[in-house]
């Protein structure tokens, strides 16, 4: 599909500076990214917000997905998850996959698409992406119209800018109430980070939404 190929040039320059898929020797500074219209799941009033910067073709990003589900099982209804697109130039199908997922998000079907894409990381051709979108339940006509628009590319470019501002150096990178975690880490690392973040948030004297807004206002660094 030509629509995916023409989109690649739009964002390529924005993705080439990132250096790794997996782990990095340096953690980024504390940062609570603005959520805006990014896909979210979990309670809006959760004490803990986890922002994920990820690439749909990155094997480490796919590897950590079952662990994230385990976090929800271990700490039910305690985390609001937020996704930010970060397709790396080393992965030629990551950007088309992000565009496909963002167009599913327009129909409130981002998370079914997210699950499908990570379950089929070796099947991200144009035709496969359309099959995944159909499996996720999207209206295909509206989805195709979205693919031909600038909106998903603009969203991805904005997510990329947020990643640069946050000094993200690898995918996946997570910010747990602003505290960074990088890579496909063990379950215990995520649970410990969530527990510590929740305790600190509850001691703040603020409501959950107010607390995250306060973190955002501090900026990155």
Report each predicted region and the residues it spans.
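C-terminal cap of thioredoxin/glutaredoxin-like
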Residues: 2-3, 131-221
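Structural alpha/beta surface segment adjacent to cysteine/selenocysteine redox centers
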Residues: 46-134, 138-139, 197, 204-221
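A short beta-strand-turn-helix
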Residues: 31-48, 73
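Bacterial signal peptide processing site
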Residues: 22-24
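N-terminal low-complexity, Pro/Thr/Ser-rich intrinsically disordered segments
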Residues: 27-37, 208-211
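C-terminal motif of bacterial Sec signal peptides marking the signal peptidase cleavage site
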Residues: 17-20
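Bacterial N-terminal signal peptides that target proteins for export
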Residues: 1-10
């Amino acid at each position: 599909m030509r629509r995916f190929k023409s989109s690649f040039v739009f964002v390529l320059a924005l993705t080439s500076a990132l250096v790794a898929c997996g782990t990095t020797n340096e953690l980024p500074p504390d940062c609570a990214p603005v959520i805006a219209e990014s896909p979210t799941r979990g309670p809006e009033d959760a004490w803990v917000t986890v922002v994920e910067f990820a690439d749909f073709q990155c094997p480490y990003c796919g590897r950590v997905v079952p662990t994230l589900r385990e976090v929800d099982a271990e700490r039910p209804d305690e985390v609001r998850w937020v996704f930010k697109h970060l397709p790396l130039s080393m992965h030629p199908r990551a950007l088309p996959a992000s565009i496909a997922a963002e167009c599913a998000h327009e129909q409130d079907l981002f998370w079914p698409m997210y699950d499908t894409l990570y379950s089929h990381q070796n099947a991200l051709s144009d035709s496969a992406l359309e099959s995944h979108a159909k499996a996720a339940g999207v209206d295909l006509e509206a989805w195709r119209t979205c693919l031909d628009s600038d909106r998903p590319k603009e969203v991805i470019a904005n997510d990329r800018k947020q990643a640069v501002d946050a000094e993200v150096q690898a995918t996946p990178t997570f910010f747990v109430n602003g505290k960074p975690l990088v890579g496909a880490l063990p379950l215990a690392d995520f649970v410990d980070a969530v527990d510590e973040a929740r305790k600190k948030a509850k001691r703040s004297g603020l409501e959950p939404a107010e607390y995250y807004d306060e973190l955002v206002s501090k900026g990155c660094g």
